[in-house]
Amino acid sequence: MALRLLKLGATSASVRVVAAGAQRVRGIHSSVQCKLXYGMWRFLLGDKASKRLTEHSRVITVDGNICTGKGKLAKEIAEKLGFKHFPEAGIHYPDSITGDGKPLAADYNGNCSLEKFYDDPRSNDGNTYRLQSWLYSSRLLQYSDALEHLLTTGQGVVLERSIFSDFVFLDAMYNQGFIRKQCVDHYNEVKSVTICDYLPPHLVIYIDVPVPEVQRRIQKKGDPHEMKITSAYLQDIENAYKKTFLPEMSEKCEVLQYSAREAQDSKKVVEDIEYLKFDKGPWLKQDNRTLYHLRLLVQDKFEVLNYTSIPIFLPEVTIGAHQTDRVLHQFRELPGRKYSPGYNTEVGDKWIWLK
């Protein structure tokens, strides 16, 4: 195989790269479309970030506990500011941006299940940590997509959660005894070698909804799996947000905090955003050269995901070579997945010999 396993050891690295939309160029053509990547010559010829980034080129993340209205607020903010909205990255985020966009089987998505986590968070098959590790990789991929969009178009982006807040779930899982200390160490090691390459958001918006209200909303929503979430787990998520995440992010970027009622008034939130000075954080220290290197990174999805695979044995996310080979071959047998887009006759691609 050309690549390593996708961070979680659930699928082959080749499967992971294809699922993430990253393809190595071979020969002259890699697809039927021209996909000239941004590089040194375009930079030297004048294609620089300063020409497209404006005061509206911002990265905004909306955070909060489960069922706090993050998606609704994020979408409304994006619409009012003219930003691009990125819905929260889930297990099937790689599927949503590749192929026909349809979700693939669990074998190709970390071999984990959110529903199973809600039903049995202490399952001894390692599902809980596989889920968390896979979701971190999905959020990492999405954050790179958001930064790539920002640097390529100059348009601001709004995300629901990010790689910077992902750890709140890990903390809650560990505090509740769902995962082992070795899993926490593995996660922190992966995070330390990946998150350091990325600039934090310009702004974090936190929706503060008390745990009893969160539980009431979950019951009203009626999802039979979510309804099994305990108040202790939700409280640990809130504690991680308030005691660790918000204090850390307040040193790196702007932070706005709203109650459940205040978050419903997106017009007022947008007004508050427009009054912010955005006078702190690492974005202020960037220039064309540093943004050039950042753009090179985020456009290369292979490199984005590369360091989420580390040589540490952890039963929860490790599989054998035979299983890896089997999953890889099964993936390659799926329609349109054997070769690069445009080169698969089984899905109707034609004139391949001319490409």
Swiss-Prot record:
In-chain residues carrying the UniProt-annotated modification N6-succinyllysine: 285
Keywords, alphabetical: Electron transport, FAD, Flavoprotein, Mitochondrion, Phosphoprotein, Respiratory chain, Transit peptide, Transport
Stored InterPro entries: Deoxyribonucleoside_kinase (IPR050566), DNK_dom (IPR031314), NDUFA10 (IPR015828), P-loop_NTPase (IPR027417)
Paired cysteines (S-S): none
GO BP term, pick one: mitochondrial electron transport, NADH to ubiquinone
GO cellular component term of the entry, any: mitochondrial matrix
Free-text description of this protein's post-translational modifications in UniProt: Phosphorylation at Ser-250 by PINK1 is required for the binding and/or reduction of the complex I substrate ubiquinone.
Record PTM Phosphoserine, positions in chain: 250
Note on cofactor: Binds 1 FAD per subunit.
Location(s) in or outside the cell: Mitochondrion matrix
Cofactor(s) required for function per UniProt: FAD
Origin: domain of life: Eukaryota
Range annotated as the organelle transit peptide: 1-35
Family: Belongs to the complex I NDUFA10 subunit family.
Known function: Accessory subunit of the mitochondrial membrane respiratory chain NADH dehydrogenase (Complex I), that is believed not to be involved in catalysis. Complex I functions in the transfer of electrons from NADH to the respiratory chain. The immediate electron acceptor for the enzyme is believed to be ubiquinone.
Subunit relationships: Complex I is composed of 45 different subunits. This a component of the hydrophobic protein fraction.
Protein name, as recorded: NADH dehydrogenase [ubiquinone] 1 alpha subcomplex subunit 10, mitochondrial
Protein species of origin: Pongo pygmaeus (Bornean orangutan)
Lineage, top ranks: Eukaryota, Metazoa, Chordata, Craniata, Vertebrata
